[in-house]
Amino acid sequence: VSTEQDSQDPLEQRTEAVAFDPFADDEDDAEPGTEAVAFDPFADDEDWDDGWDSDGETDYSAMGEMAGLLKDLDKLRKGGNREDPSQRSRQLALDTFRERRGTRRATRVVADGMVELPWVEPTEPKEALIDPEPAVVKKGIAPPVLHPGDVVASQYEIMGVIAHGGMGWIYLAQDHHVAGRVVVLKGLHSTDNPDEAAAAAAEREFLAEMTHPGIVQIFNFIDDPRVPGGFTVMEYVGGPSLRAWRNASTSKVLQPDIAIAYMLEVLPALDYLHSRGVVYNDLKPDNIIVTEDQVKLIDMGAVSGIGAYGFIYGTKGFQAPEVATEGPSVASDVYTVGRTLASLVVDLPQTDGVYEQGLPSPIDEPLFRQYTSLYRLLARCCNEDPAKRFTNLVELEAQLLGVLREIVAVRDGRTYPAQHSLFSPQRTTFGTKHLVFRTDQLIDGIARSVDITPQEVVAALPSPLVNRDDVGAAMLQGSSYAEPRETLETLRQAMTTPQYEHSIEIPFGVVRTMIDLGLTTQARSWLRSLSERFGDNWRYSWYAGVVETLLGDFASAKGSFSQVLNQLPGEAAPKLALAAVSELILQEGGYQSSALLHDELSPAAAGLTQHLRDVPDAVFERMAADGATDNTWSLTVTAPEGLRFHATRLYALVWMTNPTTVSSAFGLARMLMCENEVDLAIKALDKVPNASRHYRMAQLTAILCLVAEGATEDHIRLAARRLEQIPSTEPRFLQIKVAVIEAGLTYLRAHQASTNVALFEYPFTVRGLRRGLAQTLRDQARVAPYPKHRYALVDLANKVRPATWF
């Protein structure tokens, strides 16, 4: 039957769906397609027809009694008892897979590329077995109930024991239902009474639902009359524990960057548990297994709900002290993270094999002197008050990464971007031009100060970034490009809207806008109104420090910024603020040009050629006795020596970690110049990269540092060579040249020259340099902007010019 569709042009047919069967033939009469055939490498390529019947068997009917024997021989010849070739091939592949496991010895790069974790040799199951007899004899532990060869639940054959934990012996077994897979059998909570039985049932329920790559996988739960509570069957993780890995090192501790990297690998698993409403409770190096390609948490027996009560399992020396009275919480897990990390990097004091509470101070522990940010992070994690610890593991992770950046920068000189910072980059600079600007008096006759001011410090400090999870974040980001007055009006309207009543960022946005408008007193009043609600928030302390700095209350500002640093030890912003405020206090006290530190302390604090861990403990003990510091290296000290020490140390730390924060380089140079460490000051300034727009200013400042009061001949000549490398088109070339020649004259009036090599193009004599100074002053007068100052420069040139007959 003809239809309308049949009459249409085939090229104009509509697109329509057809059933797709990848295994169906395209055409019934198509040629044979690709198909699987059985491959037997032992089979003959062709069948011989000679002497064979149609079934491939020889007719032995005429052989009489020999027929049966010959048929049996035929079966053997044909391979009737040979192993199936496909099974043999699969077994060969499996053996090869197992044999090559762990042969690729590659390190792993983690922590945003900052750390390369070393290769870890996988541990074969049989190597993990231990002899229980020593523990039974020495510690009085009950012997294992199960022995090698015992079968549990008609499935798991016991291979032996690998450890003894809070739930008894931990067994290694083979799962005969899953190709002999090696598993671990660990005891569950006892079920002697109904309450314990209910707890055990609940434990099984949430353990069964844990699915995270960083947590050991649970396979099964089994009951066995020999073990009350039964067993958890979990995967075997072949690798050493962090405790064994630490003890295998020669120093019995891990390098701090390696330890932090391992903890960063553990945090996602812990955070997963917290997101499911449970806490781990028993984090310690023994329960963290390092494999060839990942880190895993084992021993889920202590996991409990947040705020649970009853028997809460943990390990003394690691468990938070409030667990017994307040129950487990996220804060108690944060405590165990801090204790675990501390036990990996330092030798914590012990009593009867149990770690004592608290941390060694930087005075007692050289590692904490070198990496004070690590000490502050551990101190916050292990604070006795749970409310003062990190509120969650995401916050802790960000600060761990910041601390790791510092450690890598200080130890190896490698810098990485601050990808997780809570602050913006430095908005501008402070203290970068003062020393050079002082020589501008030769241009216009106007005297200038070399002191930094609170206003320029505050203008340069980084700003807190808006928390994107805050309800008012979108509104604040939308108003960031408006004028401050418009922004203030927008914020006022937002605060009257119920939608934003729970916002934290909007009230602080009001403070920030008031500061930008110069309404410092009003900003302080507004902050005071927020103290009850947000007093524990680090943003409150930050803005309080900013306001106090602008109002000249430097001691209070120091306390506020110290609180920020204690809460955010991995951030550079509070360190820069504290260094600047310490310098402002020294300026206010008239100590800006006085040497205050022990001879060994300045180079070590700068970290350019020495480290604080190399300074004898006696130096810091004396400082503590003099009140210049304390055991915790508190940054609220007011003694001039302590102010100089911390300012130098913090400027250096910020500069080494953040090479774009050039204010810290100039600040470090100023502190070192006060301590007469000229060479170190030059070294700090020389680290300003060529690509920086502050590079030329750093070079000019270095020249002026070389010719500062008390300059040696070597420094003066070095300053001249440095200036000659700068193009003469530099606007300040002549005035810097005047400073160098003048320093040479001052030196020659008190010392004898060691050589007659010229300085610039002038003989290195009093007469030669006087002539050179007069000539340079005349050159400077030609570019002076004001006639009066031009005449003054010419008069000065005439005064210093040596007397001549013509």
Which residues does each predicted region cover?
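AlphaC helix of the eukaryotic protein kinase fold
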Residues: 189-209
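Conserved short submotifs of the Hanks-type protein kinase catalytic core
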Residues: 226-241
